[in-house]
Amino acid sequence: MNKKIDNKRVGFHSIESIIKNSPHKIKKLFIPQSRDDKRINNLIALAEKNGIKYQVSKKLKQEPEAEITNENNLSFQDLKIFLEEKNNKKLNILILDNIIDPRNLGACIRSAAVADVDALIINKHHCAPLNDVAHSVSSGGAEYVRIFFVSNLVNCIKYLKDLNISIFGLSEHSKTDYDQADFTENTAVIMGSEEDGIRKKTQESCDSMIRLS
């Protein structure tokens, strides 16, 4: 089943990031009537500066909400075009496989944004939806990272290998520590769920397995 991107955003970090980076995405902004403080006033000022109209809502308690335009998921074909344009640049890619909790997905996106990865690839059929919960936990990170959804991760990994991108899978059972791996060339790191890790087929496609500690 295709995982759709939710068109609602909740929370200051997520909404502020959209206004700063892609204000055209916001269709409606809702402000909680119960708040009249510096943070909410700063958000209103930021919205007005970018020509975004807002509406005061009695239903909201503490956090603002925004309705954004429908987004089309970036696909494997989009990834190919993106990588072709980056052919002279050293690449650092994060791949998510088997992340089933939206909160964990959001945390991974936030980490990817902080680490300044070039692309985040998500296994579309084996991952949590990129909904408002994931966006909220990501603290706006989704606005800073190129996110691609692929339906066949094994084929995607094969394509990355053909581009001379080394594939490292994370596993607590590996005997090789993260700091022992060679990240001087183009690399992609695959991360799975805390409980089960990455799927067996995905592991078999990796060049090597490494552990974080």
Residue ranges and their predicted role:
Residues R39-I40, C127-V133, D196-S205:
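Short, glycine/polar-rich helix-capping loops at beta-to-alpha or helix-loop-helix junctions
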Residues K61-E71, S138-A142, T184-G192:
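Short basic, glycine-rich beta-strand/loop surfaces that mediate nucleic-acid
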Residues R35, L60, N70-N72, I100, ...:
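Short glycine-rich anion-binding loops that position phosphate/pyrophosphate groups of nucleotides
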Residues F168-S213:
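Active-site/ligand-binding-proximal alpha/beta "capping" segment
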Residues M1-K86:
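N-terminal positively charged helical leader segments and presequences
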Residues S17, H24, I31, I52, ...:
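RNA substrate-binding interface of SAM-dependent RNA methyltransferases
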Residues S14, R39, N152-C156, D177-D179, ...:
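Short acidic active-site motifs
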Residues K53-S57, F148, I210:
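General small-molecule cofactor/ligand-binding pocket signal
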